Amino acid sequence: MKRIFSAVRIEPGELFLKSFRDLRSGLCSEPIKWVEEHNIHITLKFFGETDERQIPGISSSLAEIAQNSGDLNFRLSGIGIFGSRYQPKVVWAGIEPPEPLALLMKTVQQEMLKHGFESDRQNIVPHLTLGRIKFLNDRVLFQKLIDANKAISSPQLIIKECILYESILQREGPRYIALRKFPFGK
């Protein structure tokens, strides 16, 4: 069994990373599990623990989807939260425009139904997860820093491939290994 997911790798640029570091630094006393900079990606589909015999079929489907897809052009724009203002669960950066990435995510999820994987969610909201929140000690400070970083953005990004990753959970954080890359064909 391998814990796997498909994703697009993101290199958001130094200005975005500086804002991200400032946000993390300002919230360093909060129990937020931040994404490591070298692990920044946008998940297309999380498969979880998967029988290794399924990986060739998954790879074949991802290769076909990628071959029929064009490069993705978008920028990271704004910071938001999933959950409520009182119980935030995830800190994320938005995608602008979201439609091409949403279409790719929907296509991947629909194709993976054929391999026995359920859809992850009803409403697909393309986003870059920055951190996961267990609880907050200081909600006022948290909201102040989120509001102060609402304008965070990246330059235009051009994504030319999707990747099937293995996720190995370790005490110091997950380690991602690219199992296969699928270049976009259009």
Feature annotation, model-predicted:
Residues 1-75, 100-153, 170-186:
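Basic, often amphipathic N-terminal segments
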Residues 70-104:
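Helix-adjacent hinge/juxtasegments
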